[in-house]
């Protein structure tokens, strides 16, 4: 894959408006989206057209290298911008087992910087640690409290605990009755309401 450019994003935003698609939020993910030098401009373009923007980041050096641009965007768009920081576990050793050694403290430093500057914050965690959701949320709550991070660990929109996917396991089919039992409408789940844009190397867009 290759990085999207500001021109790429502008064309897709034009298409959204031209087709009157019911889009309210533009999300940027990766890899690490802050590795893309065009990200601040793409954020400004998206927010300037009235969309909310969500960045999924590890909050490490690439993000901190763009502090000035982030503060400028925040000053103009405030609550319309959310940064969701990936913290794979509330325990440093487990987080580093996935992210690599010496990744915990840089992430915490980035998270604190975002909190200190009153950015709209969320956290994404994983559920691969053989602990209950309640235990995980209590662990993250303790982490947030210890670092002065104003995130409600009981709010599933602010602390998103993603289920694990095992490519080796068969996945049961979902029937209409399953949706009724769960009290969920199929049209409300993410894959029914979200679309991803990716750019292949060598492609125009």
Where are the model-predicted features located?
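Canonical radical SAM enzyme core domain
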Residues: 1-14, 31-77, 83, 87-109, ...
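Short helix-loop-beta connector
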Residues: 20-24
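Radical SAM enzyme [4Fe-4S]-AdoMet core and its adjacent flexible, acidic
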Residues: 88, 92-204
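Structural preference for beta-strand elements that scaffold enzyme active sites
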Residues: 25-27, 52-54, 80-84, 120-122, ...
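Conserved hydrophobic residues forming the short capping helix/wall of the S-adenosyl-L-methionine
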Residues: 16, 72-74, 144, 148
């Amino acid at each position: 894959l290759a990085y999207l450019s500001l021109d790429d994003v502008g064309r897709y935003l034009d298409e959204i408006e031209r087709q009157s698609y019911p889009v309210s939020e533009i999300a940027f993910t990766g890899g690490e989206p802050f590795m893309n030098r065009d990200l601040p401009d793409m954020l400004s373009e998206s927010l300037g057209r009235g969309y909310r923007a969500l960045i999924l980041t590890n909050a490490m050096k690439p993000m901190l290298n763009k502090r000035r641009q982030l503060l400028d965007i925040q000053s103009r768009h405030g609550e319309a911008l959310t940064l969701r920081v990936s913290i794979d576990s509330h325990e440093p050793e487990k987080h580093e087992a996935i992210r690599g050694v010496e990744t915990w403290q840089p992430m915490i430093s980035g998270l604190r910087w975002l909190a200190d500057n009153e950015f709209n914050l969320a956290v994404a965690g994983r559920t691969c640690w053989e602990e209950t959701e309640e235990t995980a949320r209590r662990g993250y709550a303790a982490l947030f409290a210890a670092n002065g991070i104003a995130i409600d660990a009981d709010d599933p929109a602010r602390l998103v605990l993603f289920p694990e996917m095992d490519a080796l396991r068969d996945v049961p089919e979902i029937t209409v009755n399953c949706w009724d039992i769960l009290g969920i409408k199929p049209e409300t789940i993410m894959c029914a309401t979200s679309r991803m844009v990716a750019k292949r190397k060598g492609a125009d867009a």
